[in-house]
Amino acid sequence: IIRKLSGENSTITIESDEKYNTTITCDKAIFQIQGKDGDEFSYIPHIERDKFITLSQFTLKEIIRQTIFSISPNDSNKMMTGELMEVTGNELKLVSLDGHRMSIRKVALKEQYSDIKVIVPGKTLGEISKILNGDNDSEVQIFFSTNHIMFEFDDTIVLSRLIEGEYFRINQMLSSDYETKVTL
């Protein structure tokens, strides 16, 4: 719509009717948009800001990049469409698996935090990774509630519902009875 609008000093007119039909006009450009009543949209939950972690945007972007490829693309198992995000003390761990591959990435945090274990949708992490600037000096705060996660950085807030359930028992999968073990 913005590209179709003409020059700098044009007048834009926006009109809506009782059925939420909106007409946007600017010189010769006319756009008609069908809207909805705001009450039909789901509510935006309030997230308490008492349970959170802080890390650099660069670090979050990197650990997402290093684990997101092993998220399952289909919904046959809901757990595999997300990543386990686990905070223990001053360590953040992201885990993803798709039935063939498993990715685990651990990073040290600057502070001690209370233990947190949630499953974040892969689509949410993919979108977060795209909009993070990746600057090592810029921080992102991640807030947790029972059913939601909220990322706050720069002038951006991203809120997502968590995947409910118990993630796979990774420690049992990583038993020590392998013939060959490679650690990178």
What are these language model-derived features?
Residues I1-L184:
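Structural preference for solvent-exposed beta-strand-turn elements
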